[in-house]
Amino acid sequence: MASNESLQTTAAMAPVTIERRVNPNLDDELPKPFLPRALVAVDTEHPSGTPGHQHGDMSVLQQHVAFFDRNNDGIVYPWETFLGLRAVGFNIIISFFGCLIINISLSYATLPGWIPSPFFPIYIDRIHRAKHGSDSEVYDTEGRFVPSKFEEIFTKNARTHPDKLSFSELWNLTEHNRNALDPLGWVAAKLEWFLLYLLAKDPHGFVPKEAARGVFDGSLFEFCEKSRRSNKQQ
């Protein structure tokens, strides 16, 4: 009895633990799911990460940001963020406001010194300092990828399909992850998932699990850019 209780993931007096379930057998489906991965974004379907994706010895969070480093100098300026957003398929308006919001909000935390820069650069080697609250915690505080937290996105929130998220389910995800007294984190999380929804939703209005995983290591951005190039060449 005590042994069974020590492994329970739900509590009758805490209905939220029943509503938002976790996978108790995750370690049978993925080796060491609670071990943060520094180089690859893994899940139960991709235990070795994204096939063909080059990590470049960067953390998974750094890989996510590095796509927008268009000249590969380790620094992302607003105009590079704009070009990156355009490259994956966002229109000019979203790309313009997106680059302003992203660089203005993230730049200072990544700077090597205390003096702000009027160019709002984002330094990739310090991007872990810009991690905001009220997020999914799939990235840890050093920028590693935590597989168990990624799987929880779907076990806790996917109600229509186990491997897809609707817009309302994404909204609920951001509501569930809210930390107290963290309005900046609340807004940032909603903006991030809204942009992913615009970018990756399927014809039925769902974001597939593979697309969500791909955004964490940046492979989704690479896929979208290559797809757009191929379509233009046809």
UniProtKB/Swiss-Prot annotation:
GO molecular function, a single term: heme binding
Modified residues (N-acetylalanine): 2
Binding positions (heme): 64
EC class of the enzyme, as a word: oxidoreductase
Residues given in the record as Ca(2+) binding sites: 69, 71, 73, 80
Pfam families attached to this UniProt entry: Caleosin
Top-level taxon of origin: Eukaryota
Catalytic activity: RH + ROOH = ROH + ROH
E.C. code: 1.11.2.3
Cofactor: heme b; Ca(2+)
Motif Proline-knot location, chain numbering: 112-121
GO biological process, one term: negative regulation of lipid storage
EF-hand domain: residues covered: 56-91
Annotated GO CC locations: endoplasmic reticulum; membrane; monolayer-surrounded lipid storage body
Cell compartments where the protein resides: Lipid droplet; Microsome membrane
Tissue specificity annotation: Expressed in pollen (at protein level).
Domain comment, as recorded: Transmembrane regions are predicted by sequence analysis tools, but these regions probably constitute hydrophobic domains associated to phospholipids.
Chain's role: Calcium-binding peroxygenase involved in the degradation of storage lipid in oil bodies.
Quaternary assembly: Homodimer.
Family, per entry: Belongs to the caleosin family.
Protein name: Peroxygenase
Organism of origin: Pinus elliottii
